From Swiss-Prot:
UniProt keywords, alphabetically: Cytoplasm, DNA-binding, Endonuclease, Hydrolase, Nuclease
Species, as recorded: Kocuria rhizophila (strain ATCC 9341 / DSM 348 / NBRC 103217 / DC2201)
EC number: 3.1.-.-
Protein name, UniProt field: Endonuclease NucS
Function of the molecule: Cleaves both 3' and 5' ssDNA extremities of branched DNA structures.
Gene Ontology CC entries for this record: cytoplasm
Enzyme category, top tier: hydrolase
Family the entry assigns: Belongs to the NucS endonuclease family.
Record Gene3D superfamilies: 2.70.180.20, 3.40.1350.10
Keyword Nuclease: yes
Molecular functions per Gene Ontology: DNA binding; single-stranded DNA endodeoxyribonuclease activity
Amino acid sequence: MRLVIADCSVRYEGRLNAHLPLARRLIMLKADGSVLIHSDGGSYKPLNWMSPPATLRVREPSEELLADGVKEVWEVQAGKSDDRLVIHIMTVHSRLEHELGADPGLIKDGVEADLQRLLAEQITLLGEGFSLVRREYPTTIGPVDILARDANGATVAVELKRRGDIDGVEQLTRYLELLNRDPLLRPVRGVFAAQQIKPQARTLARDRGIECLSLDYDEMRGNVDTQSRLF
C-alpha cells in the first residue's frame, strides 16, 4: 500500500471522460494494482479511480507541462480496456509505503455495494434495452453509483440506497445538475433505486423528474422471476 498526498490534477480517459482540476488530494495505490483519488470531504468514496488489473507508469513531463509546474506524470492503464487515468503531480507533500499483508475481507449481506453489483449485472431491471456504462462513475463531487444508457442511447444516472430517503434524492439531484453540464452526456435523467423508499423521498423524486425503482434484494441474488417496480 502506498499513500501519497500531492497537489495534482487528474484526467480519466475512456468510454466517458472526466477531469479533476488542480487540488491537494490523497492518492492511494494498492498492491492489487488499483489506484484511488480521494479528497478531504464530500464523500467516503474516491473522486476517481482505476480498478485492477492496471499498470502504473511514471514518466517525465513534456516541456509544456514542465512550464505549467508539473513534476511527474502518472499514467494508470487498465488491463482489460483502453481506459486510462492520467495524474499530473505538481508537489508531493507526503509519501507512505507499507505492506499490509493478506486481509480476510468483510462479509456483507444486503448492503448498498451488493445492490450496486447486482443491478450492474442485471441492468435491464432499469428497463428494456438498457446497457451499463460504468459503476462508480467519477465526478468532482463524488462517484455516481451507476451510469447507464437507455434503449434510445440517453444517459441515465442511478443512485442506490438500502433505504431511500430525502437525502438520497438530494444527492442524486446534485449529480444530475453536474452531469447535465457535460455536452457529451446530457440530457441525463435520474433513477433513485432502493430496497425501501420512504413516501417523502418518492414525492420529492417525482417533483424533480426522478424515477424511483424498488429493488427486491432476494430475487436479485437468485435472479429468479425477478420483478421490480419502476414508478
